[in-house]
Amino acid sequence: MAEKENLLHLDDNNFSTEIASGLVLVDFYATWCGPCRMLTPIVEQLAESEKGHAKIAKVDIDQAQETTANLQITSVPTLILFKEGKEVKRVVGVKDFDYLSELIKSHSE
């Protein structure tokens, strides 16, 4: 997968720091997950469109097992919106760009 400039890749070491401030939408995924692969271009598009408004990040559940366990991620893809380090919304499954963009906007104030 190509590295996108505005798309953060988080792991157990940097997760807490990166979600601590602002609005952050995190996509919990697995490389072996078909629906996760379908969601990737949508998440990449969000990273571009939300630049300056919200951070968009991905977490590979197989590489960040501690974070995944702490947040009780049981299905992928799972998207969690954090505001100032606190979870404000969790959605499971593939969602379209408009839904996710609206979700971010609804929590941006």
For the regions a language model picked out, list residue spans one by one.
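The canonical Cys-X-X-Cys-His
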Residues: 33-36, 79
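N-terminal leader/targeting and pre-domain segments
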Residues: 1-22, 106-109
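Structural micro-motif
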Residues: 65, 71-80
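Conserved acidic residues
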Residues: 11, 60-62
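Non-catalytic, surface beta->alpha helical segment in thiol-disulfide oxidoreductase systems
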Residues: 75, 83-109
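Structural cue for short, hydrophobic secondary-structure segments
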Residues: 27-29, 81
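Short pre-active-site segment immediately N-terminal to redox-active cysteine/selenocysteine motifs
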Residues: 22, 29-32, 75
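Conserved helix-turn-beta segment immediately C-terminal to the redox Cys motif
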Residues: 25, 38-59
